[in-house]
């Protein structure tokens, strides 16, 4: 099993539990002496404006690491993995993204994409009956 999968599963479970336990307000936390900003509940300002997020998508945990040029977020959807994958395969190219690869199974999928400013990877995984979660990472070029 690839090392990414257990980490992804842990992050998704923590994000879903945190979203369920938290209130409706967005929170951010930055560590003293560090530029890393952790948040939840709102799209990080460093996510490209052109990146599509469906209206029913819910933002969970987020991370901004300016020193490494990385932004990460967890999204949950009231849909199964194939529906989420279909949405992104249809909506990334018209917004200027090139899909480098898109491969997986009925319950987990990985999409690698890029535009002129970022390289991105999205790992989508079924989180339960009719629910999917996606870990999305953007790396500045």
Short names for language-model regions:
Residues 2-9, 14-17, 22-141:
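An acidic-aromatic pocket/loop used at catalytic or ligand-binding sites
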């Amino acid at each position: 099993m690839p090392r990414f999968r257990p980490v992804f599963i842990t992050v998704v479970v923590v994000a879903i539990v945190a979203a369920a336990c938290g209130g409706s307000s967005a929170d951010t936390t930055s560590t003293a002496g560090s530029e890393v900003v952790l948040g939840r509940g709102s799209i990080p300002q460093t996510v490209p404006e052109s990146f599509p997020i469906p209206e029913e998508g819910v933002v969970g945990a987020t991370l901004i690491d300016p020193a490494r040029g990385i932004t990460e977020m967890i999204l949950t959807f009231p849909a199964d993995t194939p529906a989420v994958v279909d949405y992104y395969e249809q909506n990334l190219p018209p917004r200027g993204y090139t899909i480098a690869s898109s491969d997986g199974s009925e319950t987990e999928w990985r999409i690698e994409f890029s535009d002129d400013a970022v390289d991105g990877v999205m790992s989508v995984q079924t989180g339960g009956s009719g629910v999917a979660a996606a870990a999305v990472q953007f790396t500045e070029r």
